[in-house]
Amino acid sequence: MEIYFEHLINATYRAYQDILIKKHGDIYPLRSAIIKFGGFHLSYDWYGRTRLGKEEVGNLIIYTKEIHLNILFAYCLGGLKSDIPNFTELFGFRKLVNTIAHELAHCLMANYKLQFGYKHDKSHGGLTQDIEAFLWTLPEIKELERLQGFQWQELAKNLR
């Protein structure tokens, strides 16, 4: 699944970056070639997080972006049950798509200035909504949504 999420994140990042360039011109000096998917991690205070940074190699500066998602999304995707109240609402598929859009908005805003990538202002909220609407049109999201109906219990019976 990690390859899937890295693919989804980068395909959306590149496509949406192209949309913004057509809209505003190529004014994004801190673009990254890729966004690393840092995996799923347990957290009690975030759905997702974005790490922004830069690496200096001689006179070259490489800007880095990495997205992490809460492990509870993976549990929910896998059909695991939880005693957490409203677990599927809090970590279900719709919230996962919203969280990916939210973190991608941080990455896209950081293309202009790294500090902008940490903001939660009106422009971040609007960009998150736009990216989320875009995500729902992608075949990658439609396929993952289809797989939500997959009978994991049947698969697990055949595992050794």
Segments predicted by a language model, with ranges:
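A short, surface-exposed helix-loop junction/capping segment
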Residues: 1-3, 103, 109, 149-155
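Conserved aromatic-histidine-acidic binding/catalytic patches
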Residues: 4, 88, 92, 96, ...
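N-terminal low-structure segments adjacent to metalloprotease catalytic domains
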Residues: 1-7, 76, 95, 160
